[in-house]
Every structure is written in C-alpha cells, then in structure tokens.
Amino acid sequence: MKNMLKTTVLLAALTGLLVIIGDYFGGTGGMIIAFLFAVVLNFGSYWYSDKIVLKMYRAKEVSPAEAPNLHRIVDGLVMKAGIPKPKVYIVQSGMPNAFATGRDPKHAAVAATTGILELLSYEEMEGVLAHELAHVKNRDTLISAIAATLAGVVTMLAHWAQWAAIFGGFGGRDDDGNGGIVGLIAMAIVAPIAATLIQLAISRSREFAADEEGARISRKPWALADALEKLEYGNSHYRARVSDVQAKESSAHMFIVNPLKGGAVQSLFRTHPVTDERVRRLRAMKF
C-alpha cells in the first residue's frame, strides 16, 4: 500500500511538471498537449518501466542451460521466499552489480552483470540474489523502475532546455523579452535536482529492509555482508571496457550498491545507505 501511494505521488508529480512546462511554453494548448503526453507516459511507466530498464542495460534473458548456477540459486531462494520465480537476465558489463525490476512478483526479473558473476563466490551470489528477491517480495521493484523512468525523462528535459537556451530558446510567454531563455535556464538547473529528489523518494531504508529480509531468506547474512564489501571495492576500482554497458544516473538507485562515483556534494544525495553500516547490521544478525 505504501509503495502504491508513492507510485501515485510520483506519477502525479510528473503530470504536474509536464503541465506546468506546457503552460509556460504553449499556454492552454500547451497544457492540453502536455497533459495528454503525461497520460501516455504514466501508462507506459506503469506497464513497461521494467522492460525499459532492462533494454537500457541491454540485459539478455538466460535459460538454465546458459546460466545453470544463477538459475540454481534463484530456484532455491524463491522456494524459501514463497514467491514466483522471476525471469533471469545477464548484463554484459565488468561493473560488479545486480538489480531487480518488475511491477509485481508475478512479473519480475533479476539481472546480474558479468562482473559480479566473476567476482563473487556461489554463497555470496546467494546473498545478493536473496536481497534482490526481497525487493521483489516487498514490491519495491515497481516504484524503483518507475522512478528510473521518470528520472530519465526529467534529465532529458534538462538537456533539452540547456540546448534550447543555448540556441535562443522558444520565447515562452514573453516573446518580447528574455523570459523564454530565463525559463529554459531555470529548467536546466531545476530538472536535475528534481531527478535526484525522485530517486531520494525511494527511501534508503528500503535497502536496509531488503538486506534484512534477504538475510532471512538465505539464512546467510554473512554472505551478503562479504558480498557488499567486495562490491563496494569492486565498483570503486571498476574500469570500464569498451564493450561494457554503463550505469545510468537515472537508475543508479536500482542496483544493490551505487554504481556511480561521486564527491562530497553527491554523497549528500546518495541513493544508498553507507555500505559499512549495512555490513555492520548484517554481521550483527543471528539465526
């Protein structure tokens, strides 16, 4: 219920943002066009956001014959978690990471990068996938996928506004002055902040909850703790290969650890809790 409320709020916020932009640049006609566009976008976000994210990372669905260990782990964990088996995907990237997506447990998918499969042991992968299945069980995946889609749209608007301002803008309501360009510049500044706030709406507390639930599913909290330490180090020292699929800022919150590097300012808006704290909590768990 809580996640459905967040989903509704996010979709309503996107509609409001687009209508305001439409009103600024096109008056009543612009508002109507923006509203219709928002309706289509909201529908697509709800039903297809998971497919958009998987396509964004060029994730390939794999069969038990293609990835036997991965399927063996998932098969064992879904029985313990009491949820349907999700589709299993692999992302061709040396970046060691994983994520889950899908609008509900019956339409879910888990994805692991080639980097994480090379880095972690069998039991550590159990810990990671148990965490991702906990997100599925807790129905975090819909709100995460929608947030990724909406953040991507907002970021696209920011880039559009930036280039429009550089090349003279569209005048907006104030065709005789600089109102249009000022509005575009304001949008270029505000939109990335809005995208970040969308991601922060996906509370960091859900990661702690998924860690705890994942540990209960696997019965191996130490395995997830070991995996998180390796992943934190692996992502901070990751060097992309030419063929690698790169992490997108709009969907960074979906991964088990933050795949993006950032300085002190970005840490204020981090989408994940500090890894050391997650590890400390996991190591304190007893079963």
Swiss-Prot record:
This is Protease HtpX homolog 1. The active site is at E132. GO terms for biological process: proteolysis. Keywords: Cell membrane, Hydrolase, Membrane, Metal-binding, Metalloprotease, Protease, Transmembrane, Transmembrane helix, Zinc. It is a multi-pass membrane protein. It is an enzyme of class 3 (hydrolase). InterPro entries: HtpX_protease, Pept_M48_protease_HtpX, Peptidase_M48. Zn(2+) binds at H131, H135, E207. It is found in: Cell membrane. One of its GO terms (molecular function) is metalloendopeptidase activity. CDD domains: M48B_HtpX_like (cd07336). One of its GO terms (cellular component) is plasma membrane. The keyword Phosphoprotein does not apply. Its main location: membrane. Belongs to the peptidase M48B family. Its EC number is 3.4.24.-. Binds 1 zinc ion per subunit. The chain crosses the membrane at residues 7-26, 30-49, 150-170, 181-201. Signal peptide: none annotated. Its cofactor is Zn(2+).
